[in-house]
Amino acid sequence: MTRKFATRWAVKSFGASRRLARFGAVVAIVLLAGRADTSAQTPVAPLAGVDAALLEDIVVGSRILADFGVLDGFGHVSARHPTNPNHFLMSRSLAPALVTADDIMEFDLDGNAVDARGRTVFLERFIHGEIYKARPDVMSVVHTHSPGVIPFSVSKVPLKAMFHNPSFLAAGVPVWDIRKDFGETNMLVGNSALGKSLAATLADKPVVLMRGHGDVAVGPTVKMAVFRAYYTDVNAKLQSQAIALGGEPNYLTAGEGEKADMTNFAVIDRIWNLWRMRILPTLAK
């Protein structure tokens, strides 16, 4: 072997060794990443005493409201625990469109997570806990930053029922102003005192607006609370359009609202099944 040939051979061998080492490092990283992914996807233990159908309702409700633009990266859907009325169910801090059944956690009414396991929770969980404390009849709470509703939360124009689907609004829609009792804040319901004040303004109504923030809709089921959150946004947009036409809109009376809302309860499954069909395929992605 000549000196020149030996030098070339040594250089090629060194290059091949470096490539092999890099390949080995890449393989090791991939294997480690695979182990990490497997650990991250470990199934969460089922919540005690909670039917899978209720978890699905929370998931479908979260995703359909995001799909309709009532929710975006913010907002949340909760349900009172079916066997422990002093607890409620709500997802970890996550964009509503991404919520799965495994993301749903259990909280007491003070907003303490029963089994956090390092998962981040929503700051505004106090909205839900304090309303469940104040309203034993409420089994579900939805908080949104509904674009249609915001103008009515900051103006003197009251939100009123325009047609039969949002007929529940005919009972009156109070507006909670955080600044009235708490001064200048970050506008978020980040503690029990704020949540209690909001719940007091909601009183016995199905919907309360939050000045410069959004709204809260409640109901005896997740389906009805989601229905109310959706149609509150629809009503707000239609009312803005009607006002823009000029003159005073012909709103539903309290009596019309009460009778029409009874029909909503009778047909809720019709629209819910449509929404469910629309959302369930996204859960496989």
Features from the language model and the residues they span:
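Sec/Tat signal peptide C-region and signal peptidase I cleavage site
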Residues: 35-39
